[in-house]
């Protein structure tokens, strides 16, 4: 791979890693490059983000990991996006992610990934943007991953007074919700959203 291709791979990996970020050790293993090469690529990508007005991202180093973030100059537009009401029905991936967070909170994105068996960065961003989920602190130790919890808006959207009102788990040993109860639960949520749109 030439340098430009390496930068493209690096950017893809950082995007996929989301809030968890990537360490130089992870980059050297995945990209099969040296530690120095990883640092050089990170520095070059950071310079490109910082020097170009048409790029909306920056590269941050937090607690030994690197992650992409939006530029502060665009904060006003991002705030507007979050504030724009959205009555769209949640996707199956978002509903599954929301159920995992609701039952296991506080929980990290990586823990949600393990339960679902796929990356959940996109669904979590959607849930945060819709105000159903928020981050509440970080895990102690390496990586300092964000901990996600549901919000009061989540309770309102699902007609719950508290988390105690969630459908009961069929088998506490597995921590998996009863599928029939969950289907009824999410159907009720989707119906309420459809009624709001009418």
From Swiss-Prot:
Pfam families: SMC_ScpB (PF04079). InterPro entries: ScpB_csome_segregation, WH-like_DNA-bd_sf, WH_DNA-bd_sf. GO terms for biological process: cell division; chromosome separation; DNA replication. The keyword Cell division applies. It is found in: Cytoplasm. One of its GO terms (cellular component) is cytoplasm. Keywords: Cell cycle, Cell division, Chromosome partition, Cytoplasm. The keyword Metal-binding does not apply. Residues 168-198 are annotated as: Disordered. Participates in chromosomal partition during cell division. May act via the formation of a condensin-like complex containing Smc and ScpA that pull DNA away from mid-cell into both cell halves. Homodimer. Homodimerization may be required to stabilize the binding of ScpA to the Smc head domains. Component of a cohesin-like complex composed of ScpA, ScpB and the Smc homodimer, in which ScpA and ScpB bind to the head domain of Smc. The presence of the three proteins is required for the association of the complex with DNA. Belongs to the ScpB family. NCBIfam families: SMC-Scp complex subunit ScpB (TIGR00281). This is Segregation and condensation protein B. It comes from Listeria monocytogenes serovar 1/2a (strain ATCC BAA-679 / EGD-e).
């Amino acid at each position: 791979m030439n340098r430009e291709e390496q930068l493209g791979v690096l950017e893809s990996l950082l995007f996929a890693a989301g809030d968890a970020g990537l360490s130089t050790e992870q980059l050297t293993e995945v990209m099969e490059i040296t530690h120095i090469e990883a640092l050089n690529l990170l520095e070059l990508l950071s310079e490109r983000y910082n020097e170009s007005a048409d790029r909306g991202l920056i590269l941050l180093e937090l607690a030994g990991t690197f992650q992409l973030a939006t530029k502060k100059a665009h904060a006003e537009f991002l705030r507007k996006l979050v504030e724009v009401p959205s009555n769209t029905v949640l996707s199956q991936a978002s509903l599954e992610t929301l159920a995992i967070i609701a039952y296991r909170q506080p929980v990290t994105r990586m823990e949600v990934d393990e339960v679902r068996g796929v990356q959940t960065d996109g669904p979590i961003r959607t849930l945060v943007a819709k105000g159903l989920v928020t981050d509440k602190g970080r895990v102690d130790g390496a990586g300092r991953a964000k901990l996600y919890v549901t919000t009061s808006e989540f309770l309102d959207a699902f007609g719950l007074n508290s988390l105690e009102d969630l459908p009961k788990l069929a088998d506490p040993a597995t921590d998996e919700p009863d599928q029939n109860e969950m289907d009824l639960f999410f159907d009720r949520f989707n119906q309420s959203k459809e009624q709001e749109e009418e």
